[in-house]
C-alpha cells in the first residue's frame, strides 16, 4: 500500500516507494495507490498512475487522517472508471467510530476490551452497503478490503443480486481469531488491536461459508506490523492510542492450508485461487502471474503437505517482535520457492535475496 503524505502527489509517492523497493525485495511487487484526499491535482494523476503500471487504488471511510467524503469517493470512482482501474475501500463508518471511541474514553473505559465495542459489526456493514450504493451510481466494479462480518457479506449479496460486480477480500485473522482475545490479561490484548477488529465466531463461520460458495474471492493479510514493545504499549492507558494493525504476511499460506485444506473446508485448488490466481486476475497481473503455463513467470511453490510446525515469534522472519498466531500448530509448508524460474527460498529461508522486480500492470 503506497500512501502519499497529505498534500503530496501520487507521482512522488510512487517514486518514493519504488526507491524503497528497488534492489531490496526478494519477491516481485506492485502497489495499491492510496488516495487520502481528493482534489483536481489528484484526479489528474489517475491517468499518470495507469501509465506507470498502477491500476488499483485505495480510499478510506474511517480514520480522520485518511478518510474522504462519500462525494469524493464518488468522484474518484468516476475517474477510475474512465481508465478501467480498480478501487478498494476500507469500509467503516468513521463518524460513528469516532463517537463510540469518545464515549468509551469519556467514561474511563480505556482497556483493549473496548476496541471491538467501538467498531461493531454494524459500522462496517453500514459502510459496505453505502460504498456499494455509491459504486452502483458510478457503475464501477469495486473491491472490498478485509471484510470481517456476516452482515457485510449479506450487503455484498444484495448488491450482487442487483447486478453489481463486487470483489471481496478477507484475511486469516477474521477466519481464525475472535474477539475473546480482547480480554487477554497483562495488556496482551493489544496485540490483536486492528481495524476492523476481530469478530465473533458466527462471523468466522459465515466467512468460511462465503469462501466455500465463492462469495469471497481472495484472502490477503492486511499486514500492518507494529512491535508490541515500544509501539503497541503506547496505548497501555488508553485503547484509542494503540496502533491499529497486526503482522500476517509470513504465516498466511500455512494457516490457510492448515485450517482450510487440511481440515476439509476447501480444496488445494481453491486455496491456490484465493491466494494467487484470483488476485492476479483481479489486479491485472494475469497471465504473467497466477498461472503455470508457457510464457508466464514461473513463480512456483513446492508445497510439502505433511510437514508440521508451530508458529513462534522467535523463529519468524517478519521484522516484528510478536505474532498473533503464537503457538498455532500448522500442517504444510513451502519446501522451495521459485521466482521467475530461479530458486529463491528453501526450507523456510531465503537463499537468493533481492531479486524482486516491479510488476507493471495494464488496466483491462
Model-predicted segments: where are they?
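Histidine/acidic residue-rich metal-binding segments in metalloenzymes
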Residues: 41-219, 235
